[in-house]
């Protein structure tokens, strides 16, 4: 479970990721947000549901101690940045593959239950959940470049955005 931040903009960060990340990261985003929203481990905003209608299982608090989940749970700005990034990932998935990601409905549900935060979402910092030897290595960002620019707005962002 990780958040791949290649740019302070959640949209530009999503666009620059390779296909593999575009496919799998929306699910990891939903898993982190389900902990943030949970009564037991997060802020009690409510349950998030999978596409099949079942709630994400949070009883055991899986991933609650992961650095990225802790970061997302720390403040609303972080939570909303992650949510905006998740929506951008789903948008990018639709642009690249021509179909809707199975996590999109969950991300839209999160928009409706998480309290608002000032836009633009600007976390004070991001967390790093990799080996220390790569902590300050920015060369990886050079590998992730978007093949073509697209409109920076997200059609599914809340109206306050």
Region annotations inferred by a language model:
Residues 152-153:
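Ala/Thr-enriched low-complexity intrinsically disordered regions
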Residues 51-55, 59-61, 102-124:
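Charge-rich, acidic-biased intrinsically disordered regions
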Residues 1-94:
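An N-terminal structural lobe/cap that precedes and organizes the functional/catalytic core
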Residues 144-149:
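Conserved small/polar residues in nucleotide/adenosyl-binding loops
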Residues 80-114:
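Charge-dense polyanion-binding interfaces
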Residues 123-131, 138:
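Acidic, Ser/Thr/Gly/Pro-rich intrinsically disordered interaction regions
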Residues 156-161:
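Hydrophobic alpha-helical segments, chiefly the membrane-spanning helices
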